[in-house]
Amino acid sequence: MKCPYCGHPDTRVVDSRPSDEGMAIRRRRECPSCGRRFTTYERTQLEPLMVVKRDGRKEPFNPDKLLRGLLLACEKRPVSEEVLRRFAYTFEDQVSGPEITSEEIGLKALAFLKELDHVAYIRFASVYREFDSVERFIEEIRSLASLDKKEGD
């Protein structure tokens, strides 16, 4: 590694140890030319999860955007913000590939809300599925009601 003080092209590692709870390696280096020491950190750089939008554009996954949608759906509902926050901020860990469609994110969020709170589920579904009539709302509510009856048996 190049010395930041004199620009010498090669330095030697004097000490190396784990840092940041094992997420980085801290190295003390010494320049053979000027004798100065400096510290470097080596970290893994993860590629961000990319979201493929409906129009084909790609953008990095933003857990805050998902959280905003969940909070809106759960407004004035007996749902802990911490539960929603945990879902949004661990979402990337549950995705196996480098890309996910916005549709898949919506479906995973719907499945999560369906287990958590049916009213929040309907609110989220109405925006996500773009309900364009009262009949669509009623259809979705009936499907939830029949699900509740099956679980109650």
UniProtKB/Swiss-Prot annotation:
UniProt xrefs under Pfam families: ATP-cone, Zn_ribbon_NrdR
Cofactor remark from the record: Binds 1 zinc ion.
Domain ATP-cone, residue spans: 49-136
Cofactor: Zn(2+)
Record has Metal-binding as a keyword: yes
Family matches, as InterPro entries: ATP-cone_dom, NrdR-like_N, RNR_NrdR-like
GO terms of biological process kind: negative regulation of DNA-templated transcription
Zinc finger (unnamed): 3-34
GO molecular function list: ATP binding; DNA binding; zinc ion binding
Keyword Zinc attached: yes
Annotated keywords: ATP-binding, DNA-binding, Metal-binding, Nucleotide-binding, Repressor, Transcription, Transcription regulation, Zinc, Zinc-finger
Family: Belongs to the NrdR family.
HAMAP family xrefs: NrdR
Function: Negatively regulates transcription of bacterial ribonucleotide reductase nrd genes and operons by binding to NrdR-boxes.
Protein name listed in UniProt: Transcriptional repressor NrdR
Lineage summary: Bacteria, Thermotogati, Deinococcota, Deinococci, Thermales
